[in-house]
Amino acid sequence: DLYDQVDDDEEEEEEDEEDEEDADSMMMAEHLGRIFGGGRMMSKRYRDFLEALQNAAYDPVRRLVVLQDLAEQLSIATEDVFLGGFPMHGLLVELLWTLGSDEPRTHPVHASDDSGDAELYACRCITYILEAAPPVVPHVASIVCQHGTIPLLITKLQEISYIDLAEQVLQTFEKLSHTNAAEIVRAGGMLAMLQYLDFFGIHVQRTAMAAVAHCAKVRPTHTRHVTDVVPIVRQVLGYSDARLVESACECVCHWLTNLPDGDCC
């Protein structure tokens, strides 16, 4: 009888363990279902945004509203969005066209849009996409750059006509500098970020200098990419803000390492 009781107890324990495993499996399945199901639903929403942008290509007022709504959605987006059919290419084409890139082929005729607000929200959307991209999609920044984003953003810093847009561009560059610093350096992005540094507030200055410090880690293909910005960085070394000075020091250290002959300093 004692052995029978032990056997019964063991069977009950095994059944309890199986029940727990089944419960865990069900919870995991439900969790994955919410993730992928939610991702598909969110992707459908962004495909609707893409269609709305295409349909509003020649309606600046309507297009601005769509861009504002898209920016709001992306500002709270999580990595789940990218697990479905997120229309990355289509959205980037529309956003970059708003910033001044070539007309998308989806537009039957050419149109012009000189709205600074539209450009601001388009750039903001790109920044949010870079922020929301999950580790499982490691090439989002590269995809963004493949569309000619960096040269286009540089032109916005070279011809500052809308301060809010320039500040947003610097934030975008700070995100890109973590993964695509070499492309920024080759395009002359360091000088573009620093040439009007004193024109911005302290927080934007910190963003610009942080981005340049990331870019300074890259060995430049041409020394002029560094020598053009050395006078500005040298001036920043004398600023009173500790974070700006720290970024400037990082720049100098990286350049001395990458250019041991002292070609830049």
Model-derived features: positions:
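Regulatory, intrinsically disordered low-complexity regions in eukaryotic nuclear proteins
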Residues: 29-33
